[in-house]
Amino acid sequence: MLVAELTSPHQFQVTDVPPVADPEPGQIQVAVKAVGVCGSDLHYFSEGGIGDARCLYPMVLGHEPAGVVVKTGPGVSGWAAGDRAVLEPALYCYHCELCMTGHHNVCANIRFMSMPAEPGFFRELVNLPAQNLLPLPKNLSDAEGALVEPLAVIVHSMHLATPRPGETALVFGAGPIGLLTVAMLKLSGIRRIWSVEPVGARRELARVMGADAVIDPSAADPVHEVLRDTSGRGVDIAIDCAAQRDTINQCLHAARNAGRVVVTGIPAQDHVSLAFHIMRRKELTFYSVRRSNHDSETALRLLESEPKRFAPVLTHQRSLSEIQTAFELCASYSDGVGKMTIRL
């Protein structure tokens, strides 16, 4: 089977390796058909790691997959060869304190496929526990199915942000996560959404996804613009999907008193300095997002019921053999790329 391995910074190698073994009891073997390129994949590609997680080469990335069932292991029911599925990359222990109290996303023993030492989905075949598959509705393409994992992260972030109809929101970053965040905020009834993004094509995509105003941070100070537009009040919710330079602190400055700040993006550096006294004086509620917490089924239902709301983020597709140039395009923000999907 073909597998794409990141062998060093900026370098993929596609090789033919022996196929995976037959699925064990409780497992399903799946032929991977589409995998979205995540911002964290790009961190590994461009920077050799993300935050304090460093690459262990060779490394198989990709954790936003959809595929087709090939065969089932002993004891599996409800699935048959040919069934289309969304695949969940998180492998929880289900018995630690955190799992037992509903915090599966921070499971003490979690294994997340595409992390160092846990191969991801840029490969043709994979065996997964049966509970890690969800049926892919007929009205969704494989590429749309690959949106479930990132959209589930946004659903989780919305549980933290608690958007209410009539409120205002600011979103830093209009990459795929930022774009999906804008769409979910609009769906939640947010009255006005500002999107901050330096890349022109992505600002236009943000408008398509539901942003009411877009700001180029290289041309204007986002905090000044938002405070001016809100007569000094600030926004109810500030969400950082970029975590670049000083965007987290800009969220603190742009949020209203007693507002909510949510950080979905992942900073490249190990330590981030916060304008704590701004946060303290405003009594802001501050959330950091760790993936999703059993939100995939909700995300799938949203995609099934409103595919046109989320589909514009899907701008590019490439084959597995083209993964090198696909990542180079994404890393350079070229050609108006939003979400890149790798086809298998």
For each feature predicted by the language model, list its residue ranges.
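Residues in the short beta-alpha loop(s) of Rossmann-like NAD(P)-binding domains
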Residues: 199, 267, 292
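Glycine-rich beta-strand-centered segment in the early N-terminal region that forms part
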Residues: 21-35, 50-97, 134-139
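NAD(P)H dinucleotide-binding glycine-rich loop of Rossmann-like/cofactor-binding domains
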Residues: 93-172
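C-terminal hydrophobic helical "lid"/dimerization subdomain
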Residues: 1-3, 249-253, 293-344
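Mid-domain Rossmann-like dinucleotide-binding core that forms the NAD(H)/NADP(H) cofactor-binding site
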Residues: 84, 140-219, 224
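N-terminal glycine-rich cofactor-binding segment
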Residues: 3-22, 39-71, 86, 107-119
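Rossmann-fold dehydrogenase core element
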Residues: 260-262, 274-313
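Glycine-rich cofactor phosphate-binding loops and adjacent beta1-alpha1 units
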Residues: 161-164, 204-285
